[in-house]
Amino acid sequence: MNVSRLALAVVEPHIEVLNPFDGSIVGTVADVCASEVPHLLETGRSGARACAALPRHRRASILEQAALNIERDAKAFARLIVDEAGKTLKQAEKEVKRCVNTLKLSAEEAKRNAGEIVPFDAYEGAESRQGWFTREPLGLIVAITPYNDPLNLVAHKLGPAIAGGNAVILKPSELAPLSALKLVSYLVAAGLPETVVTVATGGAELGKALVAARDVRMISFTGGFVTGEQIARTAGLKKLAMDLGGNAPVIVMGDCNLDAAVDSCVSGAFWAAGQNCIGTQRLLIHAPIYEAFRERFVNQAQALVVGNPLLANTDIGPMITQQAAQNAEQMVNEALQQGATLLCGHRRQGNCYGATVLENVDHSSRIWRNEAFAPVVVLQVFETFDEAIALANEPEYALHAGIFTNDLSTAMSAARRIEAGGVMINDSSDFRFDAMPFGGSKYGSLGREGVRFAYEEMTQPKVVCLNVLG
C-alpha cells in the first residue's frame, strides 16, 4: 500500500491542508492511523529491495530526470509552496531552485561515492591480502520533515537516500504535505519504483509507531528539540540523524562594512517570516557602531511589507498557523514584562506577525535562551570580542552563527571559538549551500545533512578482503 496514492483524493479520515494567509482549503490528504504501519513496513521492505537492485547509473538518471522536470514546472511548485506554507513567491521560487540543485547533487553522489581501496599491505601480517570497501544501503529509512521548507528539506532526505539505494517512508508535516507528495510523484514519473518512497500523512501517533518499528534502520528527522528527544527515547537501536533547531547569533564588529551587515542581517532575521532554524535571532553589536547599526536595521525592518505572499512586494508572509503567531506574540510579551525595549513590530493580524526588534532583553527570557522560530530579533551591545564570543555561546541550541568583520584574525578566531555547526564570515547565519555539511553542536543536531554527508549517514561500509594464496 503506497499511501501517497491516496493523498490527493478525499478519503476518510482525512486532513485538510489550509492556506496560512486566508484559511482556504488547499487540498486534503489521508490521515493515516498507526494501525496501517504494518502495511507501510511491508511496502518499505519491498522498496528497499527494489532500490538496492537499481544500478547506480539508474538511481542517478532518475534523480537527474526528476530535477529537470521540477525545473520545467518550477512555477507550479512555487505556487504550491506559497499556498500551503505561506512563503512569499520569491522565497518559494528560491526553494524550488534549491530542490533542483539538491536532486542534481544527489545524482552525482550516486555515481561518485562508492567506496575505497583498503591498503591491507600497509600492516604487517596482511601482505597477501587485497581488498576494498563499498558503501551499501541501510535498508528502510523513516524521514520526518517540517513545514517551513516543505520541498527542499524533503529533497534532502529523499535524494541521498535514493542515491544510496534505500527505501523511505516519508512523513511530511501534516500542515504542509502537498509539496512532498508532488515531489514524490515526479520521482516516480522519472522511473523510481513506486515502493521505494511511501508517503504517510498523519499525526503524532503515526510518527511514534513508525519510529518504534523494528524494520526501520534509520530515522532522519528535522523538527523541534522536544520531539527529537521523544524520538530518541522511542527509536531503540536505530541510527538517528536530527536537525533540531538553533538560536543563531551574528556578531557585528566595529570594523565591518556596516551597510552590507545591515542588509544581510535583515534578510537573515526575517526570511520566511523567521520560520527558519538558521535564521538570525540574536545580533551582537560592537559598542562603537551600536547606535548606527540599530538605526539602520530598525528602519529596514519597519519598511518590510507584511501580508499576502502572492504579491510581488510582500517581504513577510504569514506564519504557518495562528497558534504559531500567538506563540511569537507571547514570547515577546514575556520579554517586555522582563524589561526588554520594543524598537519596532509586535503587531499581529491573524497568522501574520510583523518584523519585531527588541533590545535590553533579559538573558533568562525565552526569547534569548530558546529558538523563537518567528520574525523576532534581539539586539545586544558588547564591548570586547571575548564578551561577544561568550554571548554567542550562551544558548544550548547551536546550528549556525555569523560574524561581520574586515579583520581576518578576528574572523578566524570567531570560527574557532563559536560553538556551532557552521560559522558564516561576512554573511548572516542564514546562508546555506546544499552541498556543504549542515548540522549543529550541543543540542542543535545529531549527525550532518548536506547531500554527500547525508549519503554517508544513510549508507554503511562493507569490506571485501581477498587473500591471494600462492
Swiss-Prot record:
Keyword match Lipid metabolism: no
Keywords recorded for this protein, A-Z: NAD, Oxidoreductase
Residues that, per the record, bind NAD(+): T145, K171, G245, E371
Induction: Up-regulated upon growth on canavanine.
Active site: D243, C277
GO molecular function: lactaldehyde dehydrogenase (NAD+) activity
SUPFAM superfamilies linked to this entry: ALDH-like (SSF53720)
Main EC class the enzyme belongs to: oxidoreductase
Gene3D superfamilies named among the record's database cross-references: Aldehyde Dehydrogenase, Chain A, domain 1, Aldehyde Dehydrogenase, Chain A, domain 2
Coiled-coil ranges per UniProt: none
Top-rank lineage group of the source organism: Bacteria
EC number: 1.2.1.-
UniProt catalytic activity: L-aspartate 4-semialdehyde + NAD(+) + H2O = L-aspartate + NADH + 2 H(+)
Function: Dehydrogenase involved in the degradation of canavanine, the delta-oxa-analog of arginine, allowing growth on canavanine as sole nitrogen and carbon source. Probably catalyzes the NAD(+)-dependent oxidation of L-aspartate-semialdehyde to L-aspartate.
Family (UniProt): Belongs to the aldehyde dehydrogenase family.
Identification of the protein by name: Aspartate-semialdehyde dehydrogenase 1
Organism: Pseudomonas canavaninivorans
